[in-house]
């Protein structure tokens, strides 16, 4: 879908560019020519073309209402972080996703503007925080040993009963673990919390039950095999009041990925933008947001 949008955007940009050059002809051939009007008519009648026009209107409305110098600095900082992370392979990595440096930056801009609109139009209530708190777990650090067979995991657990030190667990990970990505580092995983989606839910549930220095006394079965998990650091859940900012951020992150929530936010943004549609063939372009844009007296340009 993203590629279709980009294609439509490139096509519309071509129309604008040619119009700026004062030429109505895109191409000539024996017996005829292709004009801007013909090209525009074809593009606007496609679902991708209509979707792109819709996105362009929304983008401009978001920029007008929520754009700022401070936001621009955040956008640049985020973009440069990714650029530094991927180094010389940055452009090639983007190309694999059908993106250019320019379209990627536009993507970051759209995301940050959308987040700003979300926070301005929907506030997190105490009820929202309490709901989030029910499943909240703080960031923890664990190390694990992954094996194929249950009896191997039980052997590891027997060894840990004799010595549950970090040193011994690390040695056991190097000896038994089939997780080649972590065994050299003693099975250590990046820190994670309850919002993490990269780990198996069963693994997370077992891990969150452990206090610092504790380990799972029975093998934890997932689709990858059998795990033995040791908690390196678990700060404990504590009180909700101590995690209000984190909980608020988590609620907003959840809403940002909820199409129903964001559609309502965009509806407010577009209504405030007071949009007028000049092309009658696109008069219902914002109907999916429940917005009836003003219609200009101008005729359709699809002739």
Curated annotation (Swiss-Prot):
Chief localization: membrane
Disulphide linkage map: none
Key word GTP-binding present: no
Membrane topology label: Lipid-anchor
Keyword Lipoprotein on entry: yes
SUPFAM superfamilies: FKBP-like, Triger factor/SurA peptide-binding domain-like
Lipid attachment in record (S-diacylglycerol cysteine): 21
Gene Ontology biological-process entries: protein folding
InterPro entries named in the record: Foldase_PrsA (IPR023059), PPIase_dom_sf (IPR046357), PPIase_PpiC (IPR000297), PrsA_foldase (IPR050245), Trigger_fact/SurA_dom_sf (IPR027304)
Assigned EC number: 5.2.1.8
Catalytic activity: [protein]-peptidylproline (omega=180) = [protein]-peptidylproline (omega=0)
Lipid attachment locations (N-palmitoyl cysteine): 21
One term under GO cellular component: plasma membrane
Keywords noted in UniProt: Cell membrane, Isomerase, Lipoprotein, Membrane, Palmitate, Rotamase, Signal
PpiC domain: residues covered: 137-233
A Gene Ontology molecular function term of the record: peptidyl-prolyl cis-trans isomerase activity
Enzyme class, UniProt record, top EC level: isomerase
Pfam families: Rotamase_3
Subcellular location: Cell membrane
Endpoints of the signal sequence: 1-20
Role noted for this protein: Plays a major role in protein secretion by helping the post-translocational extracellular folding of several secreted proteins.
Protein family according to the UniProt entry: Belongs to the PrsA family.
The name this protein goes by in its record: Foldase protein PrsA
């Amino acid at each position: 879908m993203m590629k279709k949008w980009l294609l439509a955007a490139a096509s519309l940009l071509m129309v604008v560019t040619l119009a700026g050059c004062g030429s109505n002809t895109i191409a000539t051939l024996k017996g005829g020519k292709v004009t801007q009007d013909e090209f525009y008519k074809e593009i606007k009648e496609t679902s991708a073309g209509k979707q792109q026009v819709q996105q362009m209107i929304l983008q401009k409305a978001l920029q007008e209402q929520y754009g700022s110098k401070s936001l621009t600095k955040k956008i640049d900082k985020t973009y440069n972080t990714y650029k530094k992370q991927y180094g010389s392979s940055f452009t090639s990595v983007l190309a694999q996703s059908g993106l250019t440096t320019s379209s990627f930056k536009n993507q970051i801009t759209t995301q940050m503007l959308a987040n700003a609109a979300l926070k301005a139009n929907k506030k997190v209530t105490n009820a929202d925080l309490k709901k989030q708190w029910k499943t909240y777990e703080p960031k923890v650090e664990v190390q694990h040993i992954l094996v194929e067979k249950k009896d191997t995991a039980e052997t590891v657990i027997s060894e840990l009963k004799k010595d549950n030190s970090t040193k011994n667990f690390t040695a056991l990970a190097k000896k038994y673990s089939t997780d080649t990505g972590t065994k050299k580092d003693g099975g250590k995983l990046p820190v994670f919390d309850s919002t993490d989606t990269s780990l198996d839910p069963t693994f997370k549930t077992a891990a969150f039950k452990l206090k610092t220095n504790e380990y799972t006394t029975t093998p934890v079965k997932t689709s990858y095999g059998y795990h033995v998990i040791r908690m390196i650091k678990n700060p404990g859940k504590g009180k909700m009041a101590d995690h209000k900012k984190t909980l608020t951020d988590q609620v907003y992150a959840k809403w940002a990925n909820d199409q129903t929530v964001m559609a309502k936010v965009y509806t407010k943004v577009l209504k405030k933008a007071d949009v007028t549609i000049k092309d009658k063939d696109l008069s219902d372009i914002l109907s999916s947001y429940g917005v009836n844009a003003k219609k200009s007296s101008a005729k359709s340009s699809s002739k």
